[in-house]
């Protein structure tokens, strides 16, 4: 029975996370880019002005809302995860350095997709009976499309509830325990025999922390993420930039390999990665599933923002993809390629390849800092996905289930820390990909609304400046 379920899941998983999904996500990104006249490029300086230029202004959010900065930090908390460390390494190992180039291309289109998702989420959001803003794909499907499309909203929410326990929680907890166990073992603090006890303690501590944060509602979630996300991002960026600076003489060669490898991977990898398509597939998929543009999840957090301007919040979506993929994923790639660590092309690789890039430059002592970075990335992801799950289950059953859900979600951290539930997490990953289907249909059908909102936003700004 389990073998049959696993076989079915593998077929669906390969389809959802394979070429068809990439074609759909890239296709919708292209449609949105053309319809907005490549707004993500034309208005990029404006996007940075209304995001970076305003994010450190002290502002109190209204009751039941987050500040725009807290909203983007919560979205980044869920988006910037261990995939930024392990996923990029895997893309390079299988697709060669050229995969990085295609990752950039997917991010360029993903900026417009994420912009559209966030804009629609804020425009079509509602207030629940607790006075909180709620929004996301299920709400812009319900409030933006005709009634015969509403089943897609319930489908998205159901997929989301299933996904959060695996992709958003247990797999991230497993990453935390692995990182801590590895660091403690390397320093001789624990033996492998005592790891199970340590993991149980880690799981309990994480469960308590999660309960304290999530049960405090969106106010507390926003207060935590606005402090944690800038710290962890800056911490990782400084570590990675150090590697790049110390290997600055390799940077021109690395960028040459990235561009050449995008179109002729065999010339860069010694013939091991011979397929142009494989390089493109790995780069595009890493970009898409790192920044989550097309999945619609990030828009759930942005819908909580205390703002009256959907388009202005939409530019935080562009900023989010830029930070996640163009900055953090690119720095991870440069750490691996500039440090010249041995790469076995054609074979799967993960976080260990990225960590090797750090240790080759700094020495073994840095493994403790990379463990801290991985723990921060994973923990922030759990927090962000906790909010997503709460909003999805609330859409299905109402606000009365929020606190029970948050409590159960927190307890799952103990399960993730102590048990190996590989098949269950693989199924959750499949449902994560399935979330993209109803979202992409909705964003495509509502692309005209996005164009209209953008035009109205800039017409209003022009009149205000006149």
What are these regions (language model features)?
Residues 59-94, 120-144, 155-161, 273-322:
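Alpha-helical membrane segments and immediately flanking helix-loop junctions
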Residues 216, 223-226, 231-298, 303, ...:
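Membrane-embedded translocation segments of transport machinery
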Residues 115-127, 241-257, 265-271, 304-307, ...:
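Extracellular/periplasmic helix-exit of transmembrane alpha-helices
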Residues 38-66, 90-100, 104, 112-147, ...:
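Flexible loop linkers connecting adjacent transmembrane helices
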Residues 1-82, 92-99, 110, 245, ...:
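N-terminal alpha-helical transmembrane segments of multi-pass membrane transport
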Residues 31-33, 106-131, 138, 142-174, ...:
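Helix-loop-helix module between adjacent transmembrane segments
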Residues 4-5, 35-40, 83-88, 166-176, ...:
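Transmembrane helix-loop junctions in multi-pass membrane proteins
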Residues 24-31, 35-48, 156, 173-180, ...:
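Membrane-interface loop-to-helix entry segments
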